[in-house]
Amino acid sequence: MDNLKVLFEENLFSDLQLIVEDSNESIVLNVHRNILYFSCDFFKKLLIGQFSETNDKSIKIIVHNAKITSCVIKNFYGIDDKLPEYPDWMYYLETYRCYDYFGMKIPVDKLLELTVPSEGFELLLQIVDLLDYCDELGHLIIRNLPLDYDINDLSKDFVTDLQRLSNEYQIICTKHHTIKIFNNKLYKPIKTIHHSENITSLCYDNNNKRIIYGDLKGTIYAYDFFSNKIIFNLQNIQTNKTLPNNVIHLAIINDKLISVYFDGKITVRNSLDGTLCYVIKLIENPFLFKVCPHTNCIFHFNTHGFTNVWSIDTGNLIHKLSQFTNTMFNTLKNDLIIFWRENNLILCNYPSMDEIGTLCKEYSFPPLVLLNKQHILVGCHNGLMDIWNLKKLTLVKSTQLFDVPIISMTYSPNGDQLIVANCDREVRILNSDNYEIIYTKNINKDNNNKLLTISLHDAEKIEKLNIL
């Protein structure tokens, strides 16, 4: 390609003057017929077809954008001629429009990586309309949909399909050195992330659409879900050489990335770029902790009967509680906590810790709360799932899901489905309105018990599409 570049830049042996013209300007290029002929169907037909220009020394073509078209033609010679006055999204969309005009293949994988501002959304729709439509292109449209865009400008069938896509979610699980991503029908993995070390922790950053995972060496990786690239990685600075330094827990709360290490350290970072905000050094067992999105706090349970509570925003110690001393609890809202005492679930106010009531049944797994349904769900050793009324603290229903222990429960991003896994890695999807089983799937017995569901799109855009 370097030789071709020299031919163009030094105007060697050119045999055609090509005039590229749009409504604003004309650009003259000295080119070579054989180079154009072998580069795309448009010039192949123009140069040997039944056209009056076939033998002309000068040919004019009328295009939508002369500058972009000139860049595309220069690229036939291996010249990558970017236009600094064009933002990336506009440069690539205009380039892809030129590709279509020339009969060239539009690189869909590159198109799917684009983030387009509201002023470019109509152009994006035009480019997508040139392609064979697929779900990936529909997701691209939803991701770039301006919140002030009039949905009525789109066809009814197209909006219906976007609604379908907006309500899809994906399920993530880990297996030793890999992260497997399934669609919500749990067919074969649609994506697999391979890693050199055992993956020890996992969470999803919905704000930035990234999978965050940590490994045995204490390194944290931020993996962009749509571009399939590592955005950054963070090395752990080991403070205790006698202990392993692997990451045992990760969480995203608002714009903060919280990571807990085996060596007794909690770091809080900016989730966008990994910039360190502060470090909390735990005096004893780092496994006795809880990172809580409802209270925006970190709880640490020590062996002296106290629970320290830090603000995630400031890193300051804001409470010291003595009511409970184990991690088997969930915060239901910013003022409500459920925790274990003698195998019973106790509901209490936070931070006063005044008890509201007791769920009198032996449980050993953290409960799952569906606030929109006002239900508390608890999985049992015998495969039974109990559903409690959050306000009345009465048992609504018990349903036998499996014959073996339930190890994890989560729900879909919009709350309409419940995903429950047992120790044999059999997963069942339930309707969260009536708790009836929709379907069952096995996703490999040697996956660990980390199960996440992720929404592919922002809640505001999902609501906008489904409000019609």
Swiss-Prot record:
Stretches assigned to the BTB domain: 14-85
Family annotation (Gene3D superfamilies): Potassium Channel Kv1.1, Chain A, YVTN repeat-like/Quinoprotein amine dehydrogenase
InterPro entries: BTB/POZ_dom, SKP1/BTB/POZ_sf, U5_snRNP_Component, WD40/YVTN_repeat-like_dom_sf, WD40_repeat_dom_sf, WD40_rpt
Placement of WD repeats on the sequence: 194-233, 354-398, 401-440
PROSITE patterns: BTB (PS50097), WD_REPEATS_REGION (PS50294)
Stored Pfam families: BTB, WD40
Keywords, comma-separated and alphabetical: Repeat, WD repeat
SMART domains listed in its UniProt record: WD40 (SM00320)
Keyword Transport among record annotations: no
Gene Ontology MF annotations: RNA binding
Keyword Repeat: yes
Protein family according to the UniProt entry: Belongs to the mimivirus BTB/WD family.
Official protein name in the record: Putative BTB/POZ domain and WD-repeat protein R154
The species this protein was found in: Acanthamoeba polyphaga mimivirus (APMV)
